[in-house]
A protein has these predicted regions:
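Short intrinsically disordered, low-complexity coil segments enriched in acidic
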Residues: 2, 19-20
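A general marker of short, structured functional hotspots
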Residues: 3-4, 15, 141
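Subset of outer-membrane beta-barrel
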Residues: 21-345
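Bacterial N-terminal signal peptides
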Residues: 10-17
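Bacterial N-terminal signal peptides that target proteins for export
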Residues: 1-9
C-alpha cells in the first residue's frame, strides 16, 4: 500500500512540474480561453476565503475547489444548493448531491446553470431589435469521485460535461479536475497541503445552423450560394494550484484557520491567495480573503475582483444544516453575492 501511495504522489508531483512549465506565460494569453463559466465559484465558504483553502476544504464545497477534499466527507449523504448573483445581470444556480460509500470512497453528482435573462435579438437590418428575445443556455454536469488513501492522504477527480448553446449555435466539450490533500504535513497536526489541476480537456468549437450564410453575385449565372462560417476552436481555462493551511485552537471552543494558495493560470495572470476563518464551536464561521495578481499591478483592468468575506452557520435539526453567505467585491460591475445551503444526513 505504501508503495502505491509513493508511486501516486511521485506521478502527481511530476505532472505538477510538467503542467507548471506548460502554463508558463499565461498572462500573455489573457482573454483567449473560452468556457469561462468553469471559473465561477459554487461554494460560498470557498468564495469567502477567495479559494485559498484548497488544502483543507471538505465535503461538497470541495467539488469546485479541490475534489480530493470531497474524500473527507464525514456523513453518509450530503446535498448542496447555491445561487450566485454574478455580473451584468447574470446569475448562477448550482445543485449537488454526494454519497459516502465508506472505504469505497465518495461519489457526487452536480449541475450548474447560468441565467442570462432575455436578450433582445438584433440584426443588420434591425440594429435596435426585432422585438424578439433569446437566452443562451450554459450547462455543466459533473461527476466527482474521491477517497482517502490513508488517514492523511485524500485524492479526487471531477469529470465535467460542458454545454454552451446560443439559439441554434452550440459547443460541447468535457473537462476534468484532479487533486490531492495531505493532512498533518511534517507530522504537525493542523498543517495541510493541497494540489489541484483544474479544467483540463480538449478544445471546444461552436457549430450549428445559425453559422450558415447565403451569398450571391450580381452577375452570377447560378442562384444563391450557401456557405458555413468556420468558427475558431478555443481552449479551456486550465490552472494549477498549490495550497497550504494551518488550523490552531485559540481556546476550548474557538479555532482559527489560516490558508494560502498560489494559482498558476494558463490564460491569465497568476494569483496569490490568502484567507482567514474564525470558527466558534463548529457552529459559527467568519471568513475573509484576498487575491493578489502581481503581474497585473500596472494594469487595473486585469484584476477584476477584490476582497471577499462571508459568514456561515451550522445547526442541527435532526440533521445538519449549514447556511453560508459570501461577498466578493468587483471593480467594474456590481459586487457578487453567493448564498449556499447544505444538508448532511
Amino acid at each position: 500500500m505504501n508503495k502505491k501511495i509513493t508511486y501516486f504522489l511521485t506521478v502527481l508531483l511530476l505532472g505538477t512540474v510538467l503542467f507548471s512549465e506548460v502554463f508558463a506565460g499565461g498572462a500573455k494569453r489573457n482573454g483567449t480561453a473560452g468556457a469561462q463559466e468553469l471559473l465561477i465559484p459554487s461554494s460560498a465558504s470557498g468564495l469567502a476565503l477567495n479559494g485559498s483553502n484548497i488544502s483543507s476544504i471538505t465535503g461538497l464545497d470541495a467539488v469546485f475547489y479541490n475534489p480530493a477534499g470531497f474524500g473527507g466527507t464525514q456523513t453518509s449523504t450530503e446535498a448542496m444548493f447555491s445561487n450566485l448573483t454574478y455580473i451584468a445581470d447574470i446569475s448562477m444556480s448550482y445543485a449537488a448531491v454526494g454519497v459516502n460509500f465508506s472505504e469505497l470512497g465518495s461519489l457526487a453528482f452536480s449541475l450548474r446553470t447560468l441565467n442570462f435573462g432575455d436578450i433582445p435579438v438584433t440584426t443588420v437590418d434591425n440594429p435596435y431589435g426585432t422585438g424578439s428575445t433569446y437566452s443562451p443556455s450554459f450547462v455543466t454536469l459533473g461527476l466527482t469521485y474521491a477517497n482517502s488513501l490513508t488517514d492523511r492522504i485524500r485524492v479526487g477527480i471531477n469529470l465535467k460535461l460542458v454545454s454552451e448553446k446560443i439559439v441554434r449555435t452550440s459547443a460541447t466539450g468535457f473537462a476534468f479536475d484532479a487533486g490531492i490533500q495531505y493532512q498533518g504535513l511534517a507530522g504537525l497536526d493542523g498543517l495541510n497541503f493541497g494540489i489541484t489541476l483544474k479544467n483540463l480537456g480538449p478544445q471546444m468549437k461552436f457549430d450549428g445552423p445559425d453559422l450558415i450564410r447565403s451569398a450571391s453575385e450580381a452577375e452570377a449565372k447560378r442562384g444563391t450560394n450557401f456557405y458555413t462560417i468556420d468558427a475558431a476552436s478555443f481552449e479551456l481555462p486550465s490552472s494549477l494550484e498549490l495550497g497550504l493551511s494551518y488550523a490552531y485552537n485559540l481556546a476550548n471552543d474557538y479555532k482559527m484557520v489560516v490558508s494560502s494558495a498560489f494559482q498558476n493560470n494558463n490564460f491569465s495572470n497568476d494569483e496569490y491567495k490568502l484567507g482567514y476563518e474564525f470558527v466558534y464551536d463548529d457552529m459559527l464561521f467568519l471568513r475573509g480573503g484576498y487575491a493578489y495578481m502581481g503581474e497585473a499591478k500596472d494594469n487595473e483592468y486585469q484584476q477584476f475582483f477584490g476582497v471577499t468575506a462571508g459568514v456561515g452557520v451550522k445547526v442541527n435539526i435532526g440533521f445538519e444544516m449549514v447556511v453560508d453567505y459570501a461577498y466578493r467585491a468587483a471593480k467594474f460591475s456590481e459586487s457578487n453575492h453567493l448564498i449556499g445551503v447544505k444538508f448532511n444526513f
